[in-house]
Regions:
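Catalytic-site neighborhood detector that most strongly recognizes the C-terminal catalytic loop/helix
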Residues: 68, 76, 132, 239, ...
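A short, basic/aromatic helix-end/turn motif that makes direct DNA contacts
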Residues: 113-119, 255-261, 271
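C-terminal secondary-structure termini that scaffold catalytic or DNA-interacting sites
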Residues: 123, 136-159, 163-171, 180-183, ...
Length: 304
């Protein structure tokens, strides 16, 4: 196989029709750049294994770069849209879940894995100990900075958790295996899940915690019922960041809350929401630093 062959495969993955399930009648054409990059990366690893172990002389992937991805701008809910969204939630648990998502910026996998054992309502904190992956495995949170991070809750988030406590605080406790970053290593953690599908629909096939995909599927119908413009469910996280920065919160604090290593990601993704506070920052600096300015003779001031 040559590099030219692989470039053709990549083009087909990017622009060709997808193989759909039997009950899916509408054909879908094309894939996202990120999806194609993932497929190509898996194939590249197979070829690299073959090269390293003498099955092939060279890896044809060596001359192929990753497809560039368009950077999506944050598209947060407005305060009015959020109110309508919460009002459109059909169950109290959904109102609590999405309120906590927006008022903490937690990743959806972290919300799925959130347990009452992680929460101290008296201190107003959450310790993020685990994340649920797309393949329904519990792992540590996405980044080292996000692991065991302390989220300091604002009052609306505390209120949502107090409401949710009436539904699930006395629920069943599970022993959950959480995979660590080192291969083959895991720990067992006791978990009384905060958000349980059993509250909404009881049955033998209903689980005791949500899957990440089901969280995303819950979002779309609520958006539709609320009559607001559609955006993906990840915007709940962007909404927290944009609202907080627009209110003048410290970017370093927001980065810590969201599990970023430092504030660089916050500046990169949400920079324009910070610029709205430029006038206030100048006023603050004037008040704080003017007293350090040396006094000038009146004639010099007039001349300037």
């Amino acid at each position: 196989m040559t590099t030219e062959d692989l470039l053709y495969v990549r083009k087909e993955l990017l622009t060709g029709f997808q193989v759909m399930k039997k009950d899916h009648r509408t054909q879908v054409k094309g894939r996202k750049s990120s999806t194609v990059n993932n497929y190509m990366m898996l194939m590249a690893e197979i070829f690299q294994f073959g090269t390293d172990n003498g099955y092939a002389k060279e890896n044809p992937f060596s001359g192929i770069n990753r497809l560039k991805k368009a950077k999506g701008e944050p598209d947060p809910l407005t305060t009015d849209e959020f109110i309508r969204f919460i009002q459109a939630c059909g169950h109290q648990q959904m109102r609590n879940l999405w309120s906590l998502a927006v008022y903490t910026g937690m990743r959806h996998g972290e919300l799925c894995g959130l347990a009452w054992e992680d929460i101290d309502l008296h201190a107003g904190t959450i310790i993020v100990k685990r994340n649920l992956t797309q393949t329904d495995e519990f792992t540590l949170p996405k980044t080292d900075a996000g692991t065991d991070r302390v989220i300091y809750l604002i009052q609306p988030a505390i209120d949502a958790l107090r409401n949710q406590a009436q539904l699930t605080r006395l629920g069943r406790q599970f022993e959950v295996e959480v995979k660590l970053r080192e291969y083959g290593q895991s720990v067992i953690q006791p978990c009384t899940f905060v958000f349980s599908p059993q509250c909404v629909k009881r049955g033998p096939r209903t689980g005791y915690h949500y899957a990440v995909n089901s969280i995303n599927k819950i979002w779309a119908p609520i958006i539709k019922r609320a009559g607001i413009r559609y955006r993906n469910a990840y915007q709940s996280r962007h909404t927290y960041a944009c609202w907080s920065l627009s209110a003048g919160a410290n970017p370093n604090f927001i980065a810590t809350q969201m599990g970023h290593t430092d504030a660089q990601m916050v500046y990169k993704v949400y920079g324009k929401w910070m610029s709205e506070k430029s006038a206030e920052q100048v006023s603050l600096l004037n008040q704080a630093l003017s007293r350090y300015a040396p006094s000038l003779p009146q004639s010099m001031v007039a001349a300037q």
